[in-house]
Regions:
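Catalytic cores of nucleic-acid endonucleases
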Residues: 3-4, 66-122
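Short, low-complexity, intrinsically disordered N-terminal peptides in bacterial proteins
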Residues: 1-15, 56-57, 105-108, 123-125
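Acidic-basic catalytic patches of nuclease active cores, encompassing PD-(D/E)XK
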Residues: 1-38
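Conserved catalytic cores of phosphodiester-cleaving nucleases, focusing on short active-site segments
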Residues: 28, 47-76, 88
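Short, low-complexity, polybasic intrinsically disordered segments
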Residues: 118-138
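Mixed-charge, glycine-accented linear interaction segment located at domain edges/termini
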Residues: 40-42
Length: 138
């Protein structure tokens, strides 16, 4: 998997996002996905997860993970606006142009998709985290 920024230099908010990315990665693996990279640098963009979805159809997927501690300021999905989508698409384009991850791993020749996974704390203590997977957001 691709190298990533060491957690010891990340802010508490970034570490919470890292934990959400870890959990999303575990869930995708449990669904048969293959994780190719985490926090992948593509130009000025950082792509949260790069994976292959076994399909059908089998696809190369860039996954944006959005985390919120509560709904007080809206849903995690609401943080992905048009500007963020443009930034993500540009990062995906740079990654595809390179044809490989920063660690040298070649990208598979597959259809490409951009997904969003929203993560929220449980509604009540003791319940699991809540996940919503939005496929093909842009």
């Amino acid at each position: 998997m691709a190298a990533h920024v060491p957690t010891e230099v990340r802010t508490p908010s970034q570490r919470a996002g890292d934990a959400a990315e870890d959990e999303v990665g575990r869930r995708l693996l449990a669904l048969g996905w293959a994780l190719l990279g985490r926090r992948v640098r593509a130009g000025r963009s950082e792509l949260d997860l790069v994976a292959t979805d076994p399909g059908p159809p089998r696809s190369l997927v860039v996954v944006e993970v959005r985390w919120r501690r509560s709904r007080n300021f809206g849903l995690p999905e609401e943080t992905v606006d048009r500007r963020k989508l443009v930034h993500l698409r540009a990062g995906v384009g740079r990654l595809l142009e390179a044809g490989r991850l920063p660690d040298g791993t070649d990208l598979p020749d597959l259809p490409v998709r951009l997904d969003l996974v929203a993560v929220e704390p449980p509604a009540r203590q003791g319940e699991p985290l809540r996940f919503r997977h939005h496929r093909g957001i842009g």
